[in-house]
Structures are given as structure tokens and as C-alpha cells.
A protein has these predicted regions:
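One-carbon transfer enzymes
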Residues: 1-245, 302-304, 309, 319-334
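C-terminal active-site/capping subdomain that shapes the small-molecule cofactor and substrate pocket
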Residues: 235-334
């Protein structure tokens, strides 16, 4: 079986690593890897290869990084590379580009007789049809979901609309962040895709049920917390935005990143002047008044600084009761 793999982040690299490991005994080969182009990273903005590219090159696999698969010379070149690789199947995981029908038609396909042919499968980090789209893990946490999972699906032209081949669920723990949950689901997805390839003849395509929700891409502007929200919702946002884009707020003119926080009981706020006020700053954390309840901040970071515990932050920033966390738009109008 000849495989083309398309993916970019660590979530995808876990799947590629599992496929390569299992392929040694199963007779699979990965003939080509598609991944996003190198991106500037770090303070020096040096170009950094994706985790998938790094893994593929370490195994001597050909890598191609087109900027588009839909149009122009980049797409034409990519299509030619795909045809030359002569794959039986494409495996896709968090690639970052939409695969048009012309690409989905290139692999020979597994399971003769399937219509449409089983030419490409996707490892999607949610229990479809909930959270189709680019950021299913973060959106599940943000929404307060208590469970999620991985779906192995047959790809088609629509965005995560294809028939489901396998699905397994996991609990979202109360202290899970998008980072920790990504690691959990990456391991699950890696195991599942290997099982799917080993048991192709036993796969059954099941149409997705109604009730789809969509996980739009995360945006840095979302990171700013609205302290008028209820504390439990803000806690979910802090967890969902860790490690990107990191929940943030303004305090005494400085941008503060909030890496960890917990909702605690507190009164509903009817006076807008109290929203965002620091109620306490002690060894337990920085306690901030919200629209409903209070948010206890336990790990913070000042712009240009490092992540520190609340105790270290209080000592270094001199935060005290009566100080106020604000949204940048509020600061601009004050």
C-alpha cells in the first residue's frame, strides 16, 4: 500500500509516526508528504519546518509544501507530484489546506466497489458532526463540553462532511487545556488510523447525523477576556486558549497573559464599575470579580516576561485589591 500523508502540526506528526512504525511490518510505504510551508518562528523569526516535515525528512521521505492545491502553478505542480507518487490512499490530519475534488481523485482508492472510492481519509479531532472545521479541540473546551473524541472519516469536497468510518470518545477533564487535550487526541488518532489501515475490509461508511456545529479558526483578538462574562465561561476560555492565543487582559497599562485560572463562587455584579476588580491577591492567586462569580488567576505572564505563579506575579507586579483588569477597548475609552 502506497500512502501520501498530508498534515502539519504535532497532532498530525503523531499519526505519521504511527503509520511509519506500523508500516514496517504491514508493507505500507509513505511515498510523499504534503505539509504547510516553513513559517517564521520565535523572536528571531527564523523559518521553522512543521513537525510533520521534520519527521518526514528524518525518515528520508519526499516532502512538498504547496501554497495552494486549488489554482495556479503551485496547484499544478502539487497535482503532478501527487500523480507521480501513485498513492493508493491519502491520509490527512490537520493539514491546513482544503483538498479539492481533483486531488481526492488522484489516489487509486482502497476497497474496490466503494462509490465514491475510498481515496482519502481524514483524522478529525472531534466527534462529528460536532465541531467541524479548523479548531475543534479549543472550541469543545470553550463550549464547556465534557466529552470529545476522534473521528476517522472518508473525505469529500465539503468541510468535514464525509461519511464516518470510525469514532472513539474521551472525557474532557476539568483541568484539560487545548494543549493537553491535543496530546490525548493525537495519541488516540494515531492508534485509530493504524487500526483503520489494518482493517480496511471491515470499515463501514456511516453518514453523519444532523446537528453539525462549526469550529471556526482561533483568532488572536479572541484572547482578550470580557470580565462581564460569568467566571465558569471565562475559565473555559482560559483553558481553550492555552497554548494559543493565550487569554489576555490589561492591568495597570500592561498586557497580562493568563495561563491558568479557576472559577470560584462570588456574587453577581450589578455595578459595572466592579467588573474586573481585583478582590484579593494572596498565596492562592489573584481573585477577579466577573459578571457572575470570580476568577482565581493562578499562572500569569507579563508581556516580555516569563510564565510565573500567582505568588511570583503578585510580588513582582505589586498587584493589590482594588486594581482592575480591563479589556483594551475599555482602556481606550477611559
Amino acid at each position: 500500500m502506497k500512502i501520501v500523508f498530508a498534515g502539519t502540526p504535532d497532532f498530525a506528526a503523531a499519526a505519521l509516526d504511527a503509520i511509519l512504525g506500523a508500516g514496517q511490518g504491514a508493507g505500507w510505504t509513505v511515498s510523499l508528504v504534503l505539509t504547510q510551508p516553513d513559517r517564521p518562528s520565535g523572536r528571531g523569526l527564523k523559518l521553522l519546518a512543521s513537525p510533520v516535515k521534520q519527521l518526514a525528512l528524518a525518515h528520508g521521505i519526499e516532502v512538498h509544501s504547496p501554497v495552494s492545491l486549488r489554482k495556479g502553478d503551485a496547484a499544478a505542480t502539487a497535482h503532478a507530484r501527487l500523480r507521480a507518487a501513485a498513492p493508493d490512499i491519502m491520509i490527512v490530519a490537520a493539514y491546513g489546506l482544503i483538498l479539492p475534488p481533483a486531488v481526492l481523485d488522484i489516489p487509486r482508492g482502497l476497497r474496490d466497489g466503494w462509490k465514491p472510492k475510498l481515496s482519502a481519509i481524514n483524522i478529525h479531532a472531534s466527534l462529528l458532526p460536532r465541531w467541524r472545521g479548523a479548531a475543534p479541540i479549543a472550541r469543545a473546551i470553550e463550549a464547556g463540553d465534557v466529552r470529545t473524541g476522534v473521528t476517522i472519516m472518508q473525505m469529500e469536497a465539503g468541510l468535514d462532511t464525509g461519511p464516518m468510518l470510525m469514532a472513539e470518545q474521551v472525557a474532557i477533564e476539568a483541568d484539560d487545556t487545548a494543549g493537553t487535550l491535543t496530546s490525548t487526541l493525537a495519541s488516540l488518532g494515531a492508534r485509530m488510523v493504524v487500526a483503520a489501515l489494518r482493517n480496511v475490509d471491515q470499515l463501514h461508511a456511516m453518514p453523519q447525523p444532523a446537528g453539525a456545529t462549526y469550529a471556526r479558526k482561533l483568532d488572536k483578538a479572541e484572547a482578550w477576556l470580557d470580565w462581564g462574562d460569568a467566571a465558569p465561561r471565562l475559565q473555559c476560555r482560559v483553558r481553550a486558549f492555552n497554548p494559543f492565543p493565550i487569554a489576555s487582559s490589561m492591568l495597570n497599562g500592561a498586557t497580562i497573559r493568563i495561563w491558568s485560572a479557576h472559577a470560584v463562587d462570588g456574587p453577581a455584579i450589578f455595578d459595572a464599575r466592579e467588573i474586573g476588580l481585583v478582590r484579593a491577591a494572596d498565596a492562592l492567586g489573584v481573585r477577579v470579580a466577573c459578571g457572575v462569580g470570580e476568577l482565581l488567576l493562578t499562572e500569569l505572564q507579563r508581556a516580555g516576561g516569563r510564565r510565573v505563579t500567582a505568588r511570583e506575579f503578585i510580588a513582582g507586579f505589586a498587584v493589590k485589591p482594588g486594581d482592575r483588569f480591563t479589556h483594551p477597548s475599555t482602556v481606550a475609552t477611559e
